[in-house]
Amino acid sequence: MSPSYRIAVNVEWTSKCNALCPMCPRDQIANPQLMRPETWQQILARLLPEEVFRVVIAGYGEATTHPRFFDYVDALRQHPVRFDMVSNGHLLDEEKIRHLDGAIDLLIVSFSSIDPDVYRYVHANLDQQRVMANLQAAQKLFKHTQLGISLTPMPECLPALPQTIDWLKAQGIRTLTMSPTLYNRGGSLQDHELATARLRQIIQQYGLRSQEFDFVPSAGEVFRQWRANRFKCVPRNVDLFVAASGDYLYCYNDAAHQHPIGHVSTLGISEMLRRREQMAAQPGLCDGCNMRDRYRAGELVKAGIAFARSRLQAASRNRLIFIGKSS
């Protein structure tokens, strides 16, 4: 039996990455790996529209580095669930851009700053000019897929944020997002945090889209998730992380993959959710997490109002984008 609510799913094609970002807990990933084709097929079979409203190809690695990238993208085209992808943009050449067009709804590129020194620090090991050229190409070539930007919420990125936003808008990119929390990965990262209240002010000030609502299908389903789960952690309960190994993880903050709930080869999503609903907090992950207890009753009410407002704003932006492309 399917659960009474739908979730978002993060699928990790690879836990290997071509970047060396300071906010990435890569030292915790003991066995970086590539997802095998049979595992990918098993995952696709588990993704049912009545249980999943959105799938994001993301994780701790860079999806465009997978040697089966083109084959894996092809498998998305006829699937009934919505797929999006997150990338750092470094390998996003014209061939990949054209192949992604229409296979995913939204491509989200992580971009830290127009300032070369800041970019070099935050997105270490990547070529800023190459990424910027790839963004221009994607904005020009995409006909069916939308291009969005995830702006990095680190203190180093804020001084040049207005200039970064101006450059992105000058390229015609209108979907600019930011998370109101730089997740500290279960307490493992403490050196790059900004207060959530400050980040929300920045998001509002620059008219950005808050990423805290990207994994929420509806306010009613969040309430049903809250009621069904023993551990009242909204960020955990709205999302499911499927690692490159095919393991369902307790939480996306489990970078070390120490808390698997089951494997896609033997366990469906509905059964996995029933298991997770009965699980308590994991002290090793939860005690130091800056997302824990984030959404208590008062915060949920505020978030619900903001969620409704964000949906109206998103609908308005989408109409403008559609009109712009049609004219």
Q: Can you annotate each of these PLM segments?
A:
Residues V11, S15-N18, R227, A280-P283:
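Processing junctions and N-termini across compartments
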Residues E50, W167, Q171, R292:
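Phosphate/oxyanion-binding loops and surfaces in catalytic or ligand/nucleic-acid-binding neighborhoods
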Residues D254-L300:
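Membrane-interface junctions of multi-pass transporters
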Residues E12, A30-M35, F70, H79-R82, ...:
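Radical SAM enzyme [4Fe-4S]-AdoMet core and its adjacent flexible, acidic
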Residues V56, G148-I149, T177, A281-Q282, ...:
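Short, hydrophobic secondary-structure boundary micro-motifs
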Residues M1-L106, D117, Y121, N125, ...:
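Conserved alpha-helical substructure of the radical SAM core
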